[in-house]
Amino acid sequence: MMHQIYSCSDENIEVFTTVIPSKVSSPARRRAKSSQHLLTKNVVIESDLYTHQPLELLPHRGDRRDPGDGRRFGRLQTARPPTAHPAKASARPVGISEPKTSNLCGNRAYGKSLIPPVPRISVKTSASASLEATAMGTEKGAVLMRGSRHLKKMTEEYPALPQGAEASLPLTGSASCGVPGILRKMWTRHKKKSEYVGATNSAFEAD
């Protein structure tokens, strides 16, 4: 027969086992006794492993956390130096995600990588004009036209502008995104330069 006595204190749980030998001892009973004895030893060893922490670090009764998690959390806190504040480790904001594609107009840094290259229709003008327009479209990745109204306005202001330079504009963009001031200056400078050089579109000239 085997009697187990449990004594619980503040620091750890101890299991005392008393084995009373019976008069008739068969080998099966001996095996059962030895296995039970080993079991109680394992219980004592495991309780010694987990009960060296102070009681303050264990979760309260009102907590819904798993007790295993509380033990791990307590061990992490004791291993940390006393100067480190536990709130500093969890200071990372949770609700912030990557910027979405709908917020492209206000964010120039992500405009380069998130706007896919769109095929453009370009008619040959002078070599410098077409190269400059293509470089502006690919490098900046920004919107250079607001729609048909913008095109009409440009043709009204600059009637000598060749049709090829208008056609080489990228076909991306929406009315909500405005043209940046630097790009607008570059574009007007390019138009004035093409007027002074006298670049003409040979594809639309009469033979």
From Swiss-Prot:
InterPro entries: Vexin (IPR040470), Vexin_dom (IPR027900). It comes from the Eukaryota. Keywords: Cell membrane, Membrane, Neurogenesis, Nucleus. Residues 55-102 are annotated as: Disordered. One of its GO terms (cellular component) is nucleus. Residues 58-72 have a biased composition (Basic and acidic residues). The keyword Amino-acid biosynthesis does not apply. Pfam families: Vexin. It is found in: Cell membrane; Nucleus. One of its GO terms (biological process) is neurogenesis. Its main location: membrane. The keyword Membrane applies. Belongs to the vexin family. PANTHER family: VEXIN. Required for neurogenesis in the neural plate and retina. Strongly cooperates with neural bHLH factors to promote neurogenesis. This is Vexin. It comes from Pongo abelii.
